[in-house]
Amino acid sequence: MRPGTSICRTGFPFANIATDFDEGSKSFRIRNGVLPLPFFPNDGIHTRNVLKQNKSKEGNYDMLYVETSTPGLKGQSGGPIFDTNGHIYAMQVQTNHIPLGFHPISEYDGKSIVENQFLNVGIGVHGKLLQQIMRDHHISFKVEGDSSEEEQYIINE
């Protein structure tokens, strides 16, 4: 995936999912009246790839992420980030707030208030890292398309 690729992320950000734990079956059950959940997609573009300087906790994976032009919403974490063909490129994990470097001052109720300006971007675990983890845990999956495209990475500490 290259910067500028149209993407979409899905999830259930506005849901209050009430569950109970069933000791007998050792499983969670969704309470009556919760379903159907409100499904919510939001679109954007792939802005860049980010390779963190540090490795995973176990030390065996380079931490590679996809950054998107739109933030993920609470409730979309763990959901897919995919292109217009439905190919999954990443898994949403967090939203970053990048300072824009200017701070306009506004007046409110007779007081001056500094407004820090940020760009909110979504962060997802890159599909290459997901594939590596699934291979290591013997989880089968299918890859479509040409993954030999040269990709650019931003090195981030």
Give residue spans per PLM region:
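C-terminal cap/linker of serine protease catalytic domains
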Residues: 13-15, 29, 42, 92-157
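Catalytic nucleophile loop of clan PA
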Residues: 71-92
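Serine endopeptidase catalytic core focused on the charge-relay Asp
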Residues: 1-61, 65-69, 84
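A short, hydrophobic secondary-structure junction motif
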Residues: 34-54, 70-78, 115-135
